[in-house]
From Swiss-Prot:
This is GMP synthase [glutamine-hydrolyzing]. PANTHER family: GMP SYNTHASE [GLUTAMINE-HYDROLYZING], GMP SYNTHASE-RELATED. ATP binds at residues 234-240. Catalyzes the synthesis of GMP from XMP. Residues 8-206 form the Glutamine amidotransferase type-1 domain. The gene is guaA.
Length: 524
């Protein structure tokens, strides 16, 4: 087996919400990478021995004495550097260039003129001007700008408002861009990053699913030994792939605990038991705990509080089950990178907390079981690739994501059994119709949301006053950003009529047309 860590890229984080997206792009190129804070210890930096370093963007200004700065060692290692947005600005500032707060900020789409010859941008373009200059369609998000190049650098890109939108020191292999090559809006962004990774840094594509599985199995066996591992199985993609990976690594030492918390989708409990216990031969303990969860959630309306309560009760159930089993010392979870990102629970802790995930923020400080998260460093697409490689069925691997707290975060405000029952039925109709009309695999995630408000309606000849549900469907590559799915009006009309006619207690159906950002995919 090739050493999948032999060629690696280091990403230094200045707090950008796009930092993990940079990592995803590097991984897509088949190269291992890690994210560390910009002020990581010099000893750790030397030990990591990267083939190249990428400096992320960030919300801070480079102008001022309190601006985050890099260790001078970064510039002395002799490895290529790529600064993105703030990363370019801080590189320029620390190497003797000049940076100012721009009077004209740039946010969103922009066209960049490619100047001169650069190894990084050679023969990469989206358009050309009448004079033959190469143009790139890019995504900008910055307030500061570089106005003076450090010694040894030349200009390689410009916009109308940022004459120095790109810079290069070819001798030292230092590069900087004011735009974001990691986002999909920058059309040639992946080509630019691959040029840096392969040609400038000399990395090879070693980060492949089969190698990841082999290394994960080795790590799991080393860490766990002969202990028994409990896995909280939800039936979603992440916990399902975690179960398959762990079962391949330790076999019967894995015991899956499936907790029916009363917040699952229609028929989900039966489906999970059929798939894992009967078809895959994995030992699954089915625990019915609806009353326990609903009692703990009674009167709670704050979404953060609900997530943490659901996480706490899950842990309590697992600990009680572990006490019944010999050698049960580990709690495994299907935590993946996006969970950690939105909880700002990664290695850097620089990003702002958007929402905590029950797999991360809901864990009590004193956990009586050791935590095992074999997918923690993987993105959703990598998890699906592993699932396919492990032989899981297509319909399971490519099932839409379902949050760990379940319907608890799809019921706005207080969670009640009545609300969950209504939502289950409405959601099942929506998903059924998506399958029937060949839309399910065309959208990335779809579900119904229960709104704790009532609306006047007319049923037959009488007035009714019942609840409202919202339908949500999005398209996304990475779940870091998403656009609302433009489902046909006739389809939405059909789904709405079915829900109102078949689910007693719902009188109105709405459709959510919010993108991410500014909205998150889940409502809570």
């Amino acid at each position: 087996m090739s050493d999948l860590y032999a060629h690696r890229i280091l990403i230094l984080d200045f707090g950008s919400q796009y930092t993990q997206l940079i990592a995803r792009r590097v991984r897509e190129a088949g190269v291992y990478c890690e994210i560390h804070p910009y002020d990581m210890a010099e000893s750790t930096l030397r030990d990591f021995a990267p083939r190249g370093i990428i400096l992320s963007g960030g919300p801070a200004s480079t102008v001022g004495e309190t601006a985050p700065r890099l260790s001078p060692l970064i510039f002395e290692l002799g490895v290529p550097l790529l600064g993105i947005c703030y990363g370019m600005q801080v590189m320029a500032a620390q190497l003797g260039g000049r940076v100012e707060v721009s009077a004209q900020r740039e946010y969103g789409y922009a066209q960049v003129y490619v100047h001169g010859h650069s190894r990084l941008l050679q023969n990469i373009e989206d358009h050309t001007t009448a004079g033959g200059e190469a143009l790139l369609d890019v995504w900008m998000s910055h307030g500061d700008r570089v106005i003076g190049l450090p010694e040894g650098f030349k200009r390689i890109a410009a916009t109308a408002h940022a004459p120095l939108a790109g810079m290069a020191d070819e001798k030292r292999r230092f590069y900087g861009f004011q735009f974001h090559p990691e986002v999909t809006h920058t059309r040639q962004g992946i080509r630019i990053l691959e040029r840096f990774i392969y040609d400038i840094c000399g990395c090879e594509a070693l980060w492949e699913p089969r190698h990841i599985i082999a290394k994960s199995i080795e790590n799991i066996r080393t860490k766990v030994g002969a202990d028994t591992v409990l896995l909280g199985l939800s039936g979603g993609v992440d916990s399902s792939v975690a179960a398959a990976l762990l079962h391949k690594a330790i076999g019967d030492q894995l015991i899956c605990v499936f907790v029916d918390n009363g917040l699952l989708r229609q028929g989900e409990a039966d489906q999970v038991m059929a798939t894992f216990a009967r078809h895959l031969g994995i030992k699954v303990i089915h625990i019915s705990a609806e009353t326990r969860f609903l009692e703990a959630l009674a009167g709670v309306i704050d979404p953060e509080a609900k997530r943490k309560i659901i996480g706490r009760v899950f842990i309590e159930v697992f600990e009680e089950e572990a006490a019944k089993l010999p050698n049960a010392q580990w709690l495994a979870q299907g935590t993946i990178y996006p969970d950690v990102i939105e909880s700002a629970g990664g290695k850097t802790g620089k990003a702002q907390v958007i929402k905590s995930h029950h797999n991360v923020g809901g864990l009590p400080e004193e956990l009586n079981l050791k935590l095992l998260e074999p997918l923690r460093e993987l993105f959703k697409d990598e998890v699906r690739q592993l699932g396919t490689e492990l032989g899981l069925p297509f319909e399971l691997v490519y099932r839409h994501p379902f949050p760990g707290p379940g319907l608890g975060v799809r019921i706005l405000g207080e969670v009640k059994k009545e609300y969950a029952d209504l939502l289950r039925l409405a959601d099942a109709i929506f998903i059924e119709e998506l399958h029937a009309h060949d839309w399910y695999d065309k959208v990335s995630q779809a579900f119904a949301v229960f709104l704790p408000v009532k609306s006047v309606g007319v049923m037959g000849d009488g007035r009714c006053y019942d609840f409202v549900v919202a339908l949500r469907a999005v398209e996304s590559v990475d779940f870091m950003t998403a656009r609302w799915a433009h489902l046909p009006y006739d389809f939405l009309d059909h789904v709405s009529r079915r829900i109102i006619n078949e689910v007693a207690g719902i009188s109105r159906v709405t459709y959510d047309i919010s993108g991410k950002p500014p909205a998150t995919i889940e409502w809570e």
